[in-house]
Amino acid sequence: MAQEGRSYGGLTREERDAQRRQRLLETAKEIIGTQGYAATTIPGVCAASKVSTRHFYEIYPGKEDLFVDLYDRITADSYARVATSLTATAGEPISERVPAAVLAYLDPMLKDPRVARIAFVEIMGASPRIEKLRLDYRETLVEIVGTECAASVGRGEILDRDWRFAALALVGAVTAIVYDWALHQPRSSREALETQLADLALVLLTADPPA
C-alpha cells in the first residue's frame, strides 16, 4: 500500500504543489516579462506550465496572487543582495558602499530583461493591491538609502540634504534607465551600464549641493 500522501512518484502532495508552483512562477516570468501582465491569462499560464486550472486554484486564488508571489520573490532576491553587499562593504566610505549596493539590487534585472520589465514596468498600476506592494517596497529602498546617507553625514563624508528626495530621484532614474537598456538592441555592455549607474548614484547622493 502506498504511503499516505505519496501517491505519485514518491512525492507528497506538498512536494508536488511546490513543483507546480515553481513551474507556474517560471511561466509567469516568461509571459509577463515578454507580453505583459494584461496579456497574461490563467488558462495560458496553466497550459504552458502543464498545470491544470484546478491545481492552479489550489495554489493561487487568482492571477493577481501569482503576480504578487512572483514580484515578492524578485524583490526579496534583490534586497537580500543589497544586505549582502552592505555587509561586505562595512567600514567602507559611501562612495564604495552605495554604488555597490545599487548594482547588487539591480543584478537580477541586468541579468534578465524579463525581470526588469516585471519589476520596473508591469508592476506599476497593475491593481490597487499590487501598486501598494510596489510603493511599500520602494519605501523600504528609500529608507535604506536614507539610512546609509545619514550615517555618511555623521562620518563627515558628505553634506546633509533631503535624502528622501535624493533617494526617490535615484530610484526613478535607475528604473527608467535599466528598462530602456533592456528594451533596446543593440545595447551598451552591462559593464558600461553598471559604470554609468554607479556614477549616477555618486552624483545624486554624494555631490555637494549647490550653495
Task: Enumerate the language-model features and the residues they cover.
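Generic hydrophobic, amphipathic alpha-helix propensity
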Residues: 16-28, 45, 70-82
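C-terminal peripheral helix-coil segments that are non-catalytic and often amphipathic
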Residues: 1-7, 107, 111, 143, ...
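Short, structured motif recognition centered on aromatic/hydrophobic residues
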Residues: 118, 174
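Secondary-structure edge/capping motif, primarily at the C-terminal ends of alpha-helices
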Residues: 85-90, 119-123, 181-185
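Helix-turn-helix
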Residues: 23, 31-65, 69
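Amphipathic alpha-helical packing segments from all-alpha helical-bundle domains
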Residues: 76, 80, 128-154, 164-168, ...
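Hydrophobic alpha-helical connector segments
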Residues: 69, 83-114, 170, 194
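Short helix-capping/turn signature of helix-turn-helix
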Residues: 60, 121-126
